[in-house]
Amino acid sequence: MDIYKISSSDLTNIPFIKYIAAKNKPILLSTGASTLNEIKQAVKAIEDVSTGDIAIMHCVLAYPTDYEDANLLMIKNLEENFPDYEIGYSDHTKPDENMFVLITAYNYGAVILEKHFTLDKSIKGNDHYHAMDPEDVKTFKKNLEFLSKLKGHKIKQPLICENSARKEARRSIVANMDIKKGTQITKENIAFKRPGTGISPSRIDDIIGKIANVDIHYDELIDFDMLS
């Protein structure tokens, strides 16, 4: 077996956890009905005997889980307490029409999503009625792909699609009147106007007090070459 899943019911079964961990394979550790301290003990038990990967799965041990009991923010809490491990979500809620529970779990940082699957939700038993069927999977896949597009990149920086607006919508320093050669640049004889292709207003301190070495016309973009 390439990956082992330890269910929530065995989270405190430390001898069993160590037995599985000794196989040195990746482990999915479900955490339903557990305290943070119990999870830490289970993780340490794995770490003591294994160098395999560990994924810690937020889970609510209730079948089905009511939406108000899903507590998806616990995914964030697990991230904070176990920054070295991937965090996932094992879902027992009934599928909603947009698969919003799983989508939200992904948006909160779950990188592994576990959900029961069935071909027929009407089959008797404790697993089928809250499982995904093929149509649910299609909906989930479609919405997950859409959300992935929306999430984009993490690092804040100008985007290619903003290049034109960055130039045209930003302000530049311009002459607020005709400025004769030899005139000192002051706050009174400049203004800030579009486009943003000249000197940024953020550099106002770099030009105040400078002397115009050419005639600068009203509304003309001021350039450093015009100043001394």
Give the positions of each predicted feature.
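Catalytic cores and adjacent flexible loops of soluble metabolic enzymes
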Residues: 1-228
